[in-house]
């Protein structure tokens, strides 16, 4: 799990480097570094998925989570669907900066839920706390759009809505027989 943490922290570092390169007018270098970012995103998808499956198989489940592990598995696995979807869309919109940067930001916001849930006291408050605090980043982006563009950018509207709608959907899906059967099957893939 240390590798997982280092790689995911690397994504945050990459985001800072990439935004600094663009702000400094070095879009040529930004594009080159972006290719490494795509590889990093693939590594994150693999590590995030495998890490979640391993945690769900442990007798203790997810550290500090008072929910049965197979049920809670929906939370990180939905992240591992949204994150690469936002990254793939961002890469497809490389030539449209307003779309690209918002999609990359949304991909990063997806990752913050796990980090926020680890803050002292947050996990004990349940999903409204860790999802709600994550959603504040989407709200900040929406406020930025309204102030700068005078309207919500379509990526902010639809991407933010997809992220926010996925949160209660995870909770509803996670308790179903179909989800639990899938979770048993998925964790069984590890051997």
Task: Tell me what each language-model feature is.
Residues 1-191:
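Alpha-helical membrane insertion/targeting regions
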């Amino acid at each position: 799990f240390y590798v997982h943490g280092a790689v995911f922290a690397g994504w945050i570092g990459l985001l800072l480097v990439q935004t600094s390169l663009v702000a400094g007018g070095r879009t040529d270098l930004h594009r080159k570094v972006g290719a490494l970012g795509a590889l990093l995103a693939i590594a994150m998808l693999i590590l995030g998925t495998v890490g979640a499956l391993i945690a769900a198989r442990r007798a203790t489940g997810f550290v500090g989570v008072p929910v049965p592990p197979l049920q809670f598995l929906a939370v990180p696995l939905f992240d591992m669907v949204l994150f690469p979807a936002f990254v793939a869309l961002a890469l497809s919109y490389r030539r449209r900066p307003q779309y690209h940067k918002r999609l990359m930001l949304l991909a990063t916001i997806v990752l913050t839920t796990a980090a926020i849930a680890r803050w002292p006291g947050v996990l004990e408050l349940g999903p409204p706390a860790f999802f709600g605090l994550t959603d504040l980043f989407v709200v900040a982006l929406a406020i930025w759009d309204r102030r700068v563009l005078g309207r919500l950018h379509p990526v902010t509207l639809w991407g933010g809505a997809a992220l926010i709608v996925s949160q209660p959907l995870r909770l509803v899906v996670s308790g179903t027989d179909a989800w639990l059967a899938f979770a048993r099957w998925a964790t069984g893939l590890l051997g």
